[in-house]
Amino acid sequence: MLSTRVEKLSSGRLLRIARMGSGPPVVLLHGYPDNLQIWSELAIRLADQFEVIAFDWPGMGYSEAWPGGTTPFHMAERLHKILDELAIERASLVGMDMGGQPALVFAASHPERIHRLVVMNSLVLWDEKTSWEIQVLRKYGWNRFILRKFPRLVFSRAERTFLPLGRKLPSELRADLWKSFSQSDVRFFIARLCAGYQGTLMQLPEAYKKITCPTLALWGEQDQHFPPNHARRLCATVPGSILKIIPEAKHWMAWYLADTVAQTIRTFLA
């Protein structure tokens, strides 16, 4: 587990953060139902060469929500403000799941603030195939209802489908993820987040075309929620981007295949 602290930002709002290592900064952006601890295995493997920063998105994990919208554009601007607060002038970004879209938008909007970009296992195209679970959760009414009434179902389904059969999260990590996801205000924010993302997915490819930094689409071959064709089409849109598919890997490969993922990222960032 990563050692964390809660920082009070200039706005007075609280942000949970983990920061370790030294070298060029690398910022890790999580999705849901996780929080920054999903990076626990990857972060320690990158910290020998980089300063690694992971935080709970405002409104998720154990960070306080911020006012305003919930589209990838809003989330990218929150990332921008957080980097300012942390005095990080320029960083590489690694975004997974719902951390991928804000990372892409940030790269397009703030090219002077990003060194390199890694996107993993994310819903990046509105018209590409997803799992039936994601199809349901992309409908705001169903999304809001399921997240409000059946959080254990959502969380347990993620565990079963994000990991290989028979693989389980260690109890301490699982407890941290579940404790944050079980909070009703976190799930309410996630429902809004899903709606905000769904409403802007059609606009995102225009942003992707503006990205100029070196970009790696790093995908799990067996991510059933966002199959590798998302990555292939993303690479066809982002100029000069690179595609790497990890054989047999599933959605949470950053945790259970941390050695492989870390080596791939280190090579790309070198």
Predicted regions and their residues:
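Short beta-strand/loop motif that positions the catalytic acidic residue
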Residues: 211, 217-219
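Alpha/beta-hydrolase fold catalytic core
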Residues: 1-26, 47-50, 84, 88-90, ...
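Acidic catalytic loop of the alpha/beta-hydrolase fold
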Residues: 222-226
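Flexible "cap/lid" loop of the alpha/beta hydrolase fold
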Residues: 108, 115-146
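Active-site loop/oxyanion-hole signature of alpha/beta-hydrolase fold enzymes
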Residues: 54-95, 263
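Conserved HGGG/HGGXW glycine-rich cap/lid loop of the alpha/beta-hydrolase fold
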Residues: 18-62
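Catalytic histidine-centered segment of alpha/beta-hydrolase-like enzymes
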Residues: 249-258, 262
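Conserved alpha/beta-hydrolase catalytic His-Asp/Glu region
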Residues: 130, 149-209
